[in-house]
Curated annotation (Swiss-Prot):
HAMAP family per record: GcvPB
Name the UniProt record assigns to this protein: Probable glycine dehydrogenase (decarboxylating) subunit 2
Lineage, uppermost ranks: Bacteria, Bacillati, Bacillota, Bacilli, Bacillales
Molecular function terms from GO: glycine binding; glycine dehydrogenase (decarboxylating) activity; pyridoxal phosphate binding
SUPFAM superfamilies in the record: PLP-dependent transferases
Catalytic activity entry: N(6)-[(R)-lipoyl]-L-lysyl-[glycine-cleavage complex H protein] + glycine + H(+) = N(6)-[(R)-S(8)-aminomethyldihydrolipoyl]-L-lysyl-[glycine-cleavage complex H protein] + CO2
Highest taxon, organism lineage: Bacteria
Annotated organism of origin: Staphylococcus epidermidis (strain ATCC 35984 / DSM 28319 / BCRC 17069 / CCUG 31568 / BM 3577 / RP62A)
Quaternary organization: The glycine cleavage system is composed of four proteins: P, T, L and H. In this organism, the P 'protein' is a heterodimer of two subunits.
Length: 502
C-alpha cells in the first residue's frame, strides 16, 4: 500500500514527460493495421504514465524501501518456511549460459541446462524416496493438482473410474480440497484426534470403495508428526486408494525420514520453500512431483533423461497426463534449489531439519505460560498457539498480529488451521539466530501482557507503520482495482462507491 507521501506512478505522470528517447527510426514504417486483424488493434492509446527517469527510479526505490521480506526482518509465517535464501543461489542463476538460454534451443546447445534438470530430478528422488520425479509443475498447488490428475488417470486405466473421493484432514492446507475439486474429485474430511493427528477410527469410517486417495502433510499443519502413518497407509491402500504427500512441511524431516519410506505413492515439493527459491511476491515458484514406479508412466511429458553421455527430452511416456507447464517449468528456480542442495549435502540438510525443529520447540517452550497451547507434545518445525486467553480481554489474534508489526516482525499465519480457535501458526525456520528468536518471544510476551493491562494499545495497533488498519470488508466487497476507478472516485468516500461501477 502506498502512503499519501508516495503518489501512484499514474499520479506522477505529466504529459510529454519521458524517461528515455529512442534513436530515429532508419527503416520503413509499417502500419500495424497491415499486420494484425482490426480486432487486435487498440481503438485508443494506452494510458501509460509519462514520467522522467529520476521520478521513475525514485518511485520504485520508495516502494522497495517499504517492502518487507526475510532479508529485512523475522518472518515466522507458519506453513510457509520463510527461510533465508543464500545469495550464492542468485549468483549461479545469473550465469549467462543459463540466464541467456532459450527453451526452444536445440538439445545439443543446452546440454548444461538439461544436465541441471536431470541432476535435480535425481537429487529429489533420493530426498523423497520416490522412483521418478517431474519438475514441470509451477508451484505447490499446481503440484497437488498434477499428482491428483496422475491418480485419476491411474484409477481410470485400472477400471476404477468410480473412485471420486479424496480424503483430507480437518487440519489440511486449504489448497488440498481446492486441488481435489479442481481435479474433479469430491473432498471428504477426516477428523483429528486429541493429539492433533488423524483419527484412525474416523478414517476407517470415511474410507470406502469410492476412495481415490488421502492427502496428508507429515508433520501435519499443526506441526505434529503423524505417528500412525503406516497404519493410515495400510487402511487406504487396502481400500484401493493412494497416498499423497503434501511437501509443504518437508523442512522438518530432511534426511530423517522420506515420504516414500512412509508409504506415500506421490509427493509434491516446494522448491521455493524447503530449497530456498525466492519466496513471496507472487512467484515464480516450483512444485516438482515425485511418484512410485507404478505411477511413473503417467507423469507429464517430456521428461529429461540421460542417454549415455548426453541429456535429452523423452516424450515416450505411454500413459502421460500430458504437459502441465509451457516448456519445462521455472528453470531459474531449479538452479537455485540445485545450488542449495549441493551446497548443503546430506548432512547439511539433516542439520537444517534439526535446527528448524529446535527453534520451533524453543519458542513454544518459552510462550507456553503466556498463551494457550492446544497440543502440548513436542512439535516439529512449527506449532500452533491459541489466542483464547487474550480473547477474554476483548483482544483477538488479529489484533496481536497487527501489534507485532510495531516490533518490525512479520506476523505468523493466523486463524489457520481451522480446527484451532484464534489460532496463530509460528514457523521460525532453521536460519534464525537465538537472538532473533528471543526478540520475537519477548515481543509476544509483551503483547500478551498488554492485552490485560493496556488492551487499547493492541486493539489500535499498528502504531508505527505507514498505514494502520485497512477497511478489509469494503476492500473485498467494493475493490478499486484500476487507476481509472481511483481517479473517478477521488473525491468520494470509498464506502459510497456504487458496486455497479466496479
Amino acid at each position: 500500500m502506498i502512503s499519501k507521501s508516495s503518489p501512484l506512478i499514474f499520479e506522477r505522470s505529466k504529459k510529454d514527460r519521458y524517461a528515455y528517447s529512442l534513436p530515429q527510426n532508419d527503416i520503413e514504417n509499417i502500419s500495424i493495421a497491415s499486420l494484425l486483424d482490426d480486432k487486435y488493434i487498440r481503438k485508443h492509446k494506452a494510458e501509460f504514465p509519462e514520467v522522467s527517469e529520476l521520478d521513475l527510479v525514485r518511485h520504485y526505490t520508495e516502494l522497495s524501501n517499504k517492502n518487507f521480506g526475510v532479508d529485512t526482518g523475522f518472518y515466522p509465517l507458519g506453513s510457509c518456511t520463510m527461510k533465508y535464501n543464500p545469495k550464492i543461489n542468485e549468483k549461479v542463476a545469473r550465469i549467462s549460459g543459463f540466464s541467456e538460454s532459450h527453451p526452444l534451443q536445440e538439445e545439443e546447445h543446452v546440454q548444461g541446462s538439461l544436465e541441471i534438470i536431470y541432476s535435480l530430478q535425481e537429487e529429489l528422488k533420493e530426498i523423497t524416496g520416490m522412483d521418478e520425479v517431474t519438475l514441470q509443475p509451477a508451484a505447490g498447488a499446481h503440484g497437488e493438482w498434477t499428482a491428483l490428475m496422475i491418480f485419476k488417470a491411474y484409477h481410470e486405466k485400472n477400471g476404477q473410474s468410480h473412485r471420486d473421493e479424496v480424503i483430507v484432514p480437518d487440519s489440511a492446507h486449504g489448497t488440498n480440497p481446492a486441488s481435489a475439486s479442481f481435479a474433479g474429485f469430491k473432498s471428504v474430511t477426516v477428523k483429528s484426534n486429541q493429539r492433533g493427528e488423524v483419527d484412525i477410527e474416523d478414517l476407517k469410517r470415511v474410507v470406502n470403495d469410492n476412495t481415490a486417495a488421502i492427502m496428508l502433510t507429515n508433520p501435519n499443519t499443526l506441526g505434529i508428526f503423524e505417528q500412525d502413518i503406516i497404519e493410515i497407509g495400510k487402511i487406504v491402500h487396502e481400500a484401493g486408494g493412494l497416498l499423497y504427500y503434501d511437501g509443504a512441511n518437508l523442512n522438518a524431516i530432511l534426511d530423517k525420514v522420506r515420504p516414500g519410506d512412509m508409504g506415500f505413492d506421490a509427493v509434491h515439493l516446494n522448491l521455493h520453500k524447503t530449497f530456498t527459491g525466492p519466496h513471496g511476491g507472487g512467484g515464480p515458484g516450483s512444485g516438482p512431483v515425485g511418484v512410485v514406479e507404478k505411477l511413473a508412466s503417467y507423469l507429464p511429458k517430456p521428461m529429461v533423461i540421460k542417454d549415455n553421455d548426453r541429456y535429452k527430452y523423452d516424450n515416450d511416456i505411454p500413459n502421460s497426463i500430458g504437459r502441465v507447464k509451457p516448456f519445462y517449468g521455472n528453470f531459474g528456480i531449479y538452479l537455485r534449489a540445485y545450488t542449495y542442495i549441493r551446497s548443503m549435502g546430506a548432512n547439511g540438510l539433516k542439520e537444517v531439519s534439526e535446527a528448524a525443529v529446535l527453534n520451533a520447540n524453543y519458542i513454544k517452550s518459552r510462550l507456553k505460560n503466556h498463551f494457550e497451547i492446544p497440543f502440548n507434545q513436542y512439535c516439529k518445525h512449527e506449532f500452533v498457539l491459541s489466542g483464547t486467553l487474550q480473547k477474554q480481554y476483548g483482544v483477538r489474534t488479529l489484533d496481536m498480529a497487527k501489534r507485532l508489526l510495531d516490533f518490525g516482525v512479520h506476523p505468523p499465519t493466523i486463524y489457520f488451521p481451522l480446527n484451532v480457535e484464534e489460532g496463530m501458526m509460528i514457523e521460525p525456520t532453521e536460519t534464525e539466530s537465538k537472538e532473533t528468536l528471543d526478540y520475537f518471544i519477548d515481543a509476544m510476551i509483551q503483547i500478551a501482557d498488554e492485552t490485560k493491562n493496556d488492551p487499547d494499545k493492541v486493539l489500535e495497533a499498528p502504531h508505527t507503520t505507514i498505514i494502520d488498519r485497512l477497511d478489509e470488508t469494503t476492500a473485498a466487497r467494493k475493490p478499486i482495482l484500476k487507476f481509472e476507478e481511483l481517479k473517478d472516485e477521488k473525491y468520494k468516500e470509498h464506502t459510497n462507491i456504487d458496486s455497479e461501477d466496479n
